[in-house]
Amino acid sequence: ARPGPPVAPVPEPLRGYLGKPISELGWMPVMAGMREYQLPEFAGRAGVRLLAIEPGRRMPRHTHEGLELTLVLQGSFADASGDYAKGDVATADASVDHQPQAGGREVCLCLAIEDAPLKLTGFNGMVINAAATVRKLVGR
């Protein structure tokens, strides 16, 4: 059975932007074991999204074209810079090339804010980036 969206409590300041319980948001699958919800309030300005990552799941290896701040709302994750649990904030920029992995036994729920796009790296990143370039060239 596929796990449903997370049901973690959300900090009060964030609840006003969501407008509904976290379990009722329009979560979009990103890859197996990972979903996201883009906060429409910030569309076109900054990348502000919620990420839900199943325990043990690794995100694709990536770096950053700008600054990323990630607040852990539930669960935990780790990368080469350390371990992050509920309430921790991780920062990353163009000097960081990492592959965060969700830990623990519960979904890792994070609020991620990016002022520029991520850039996938490693072999899988090269394949995905090449496919995205081809789609742009053929207009899809």
Residue ranges of model-derived segments:
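Glycine- and acidic-residue-biased ligand/ion/polar-headgroup-sensing regions
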Residues: 54-57, 63-79
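Positively biased amphipathic helices and basic secretion/translocation or surface-docking motifs
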Residues: 1-23
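Short beta-strand His + acidic residue motifs that chelate non-heme Fe in jelly-roll/DSBH
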Residues: 59-61, 80, 98-104
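Ligand-binding loop in jelly-roll beta-barrel domains
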Residues: 96-120
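Short acidic-glycine-tyrosine-enriched beta hairpin
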Residues: 79-99
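Double-stranded beta-helix
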Residues: 111-140
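A short glycine-rich, His/Asp/Glu-containing loop-to-beta-strand
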Residues: 23-60
